[in-house]
């Protein structure tokens, strides 16, 4: 793994050297895919573009740790994708022993390209005052947050430039983000203080979208909490509101294979809590209605209607105090 900071030119140039992962998920019949969750996951993964091989070696180097507000914060540099290092934080309870539940925290966008994983320890204006690193460690959990492509210490290249450079090479920015989340999960579950049978993922806005994509693709995720970005794609199209989401959000040909509800159905019957603002333009209410209706049917068919819940609040794009309490209660119940 490279020890020096990657330059914009070096990263853009090295993207073309990625290996292509062969998949068979899109070769089956539509009927088979519709009734076989494994086939549907393979189909969804295939839409992520030319990501590195899923089984390429991944590793991490611990750079240090410090005591912070009742927990221990570890700083890591991960080798996940073979293109550029991935900075990460891991927060663990100060007084804890044995294996603990683990949470993959997915940071938001909000135009804060320089922020990235710092949201985990510092919070954001649209989140409740207690940062999630403290909230989760106070619950006795171990949690990880990485800098995603074009954010935090990886903000050397603009979102638009990275999206276009990847597109030229058959890659998808969102696909590379999801890939990094999957590989970070691989490493996180190898920790001696993490119980691999008790893993959750949680995020706000872009982090919300990452949470439900990650859980849809990775059955090791037992609990999903998505805050304010359970967007129905057709509702967004109908409102002509595509510009409200960053370009990172758009995956070629996605709508010819999946609706948002169909992606989220791959999480069932695992526990899933969605939270939404009734005045949030990123999640049109009619789209929330559609997703909620379909997922209620899916979870009922699995015999676990209690594992799906969509809570709505009379706010715009923000987490509420009531929502934070509901999130904590949901994690305590299902994780």
Question: Where in this protein do the model-derived segments appear?
Answer:
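C-terminal segment of N-terminal export signals and the immediately downstream linker at the start
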Residues: 5, 10, 25-39
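Short beta-strand element of the alpha/beta-hydrolase
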Residues: 99-108
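Mobile cap/lid helix-loop segments that gate and shape the active-site cleft of serine hydrolases
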Residues: 223-264, 269, 282-292, 300-304
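C-terminal catalytic histidine-bearing segment of alpha/beta-hydrolase fold enzymes
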Residues: 293, 298-335
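Gly/Ser-rich "nucleophile elbow"/oxyanion-hole loop immediately N-terminal to the catalytic nucleophile
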Residues: 162-205
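Cap/lid segment of the alpha/beta-hydrolase catalytic domain
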Residues: 108-179, 237-238
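N-terminal cap/lid segment of alpha/beta-hydrolase-fold proteins
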Residues: 58-95
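N-terminal secretory signal peptides and thylakoid transit peptides that target proteins
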Residues: 2-19
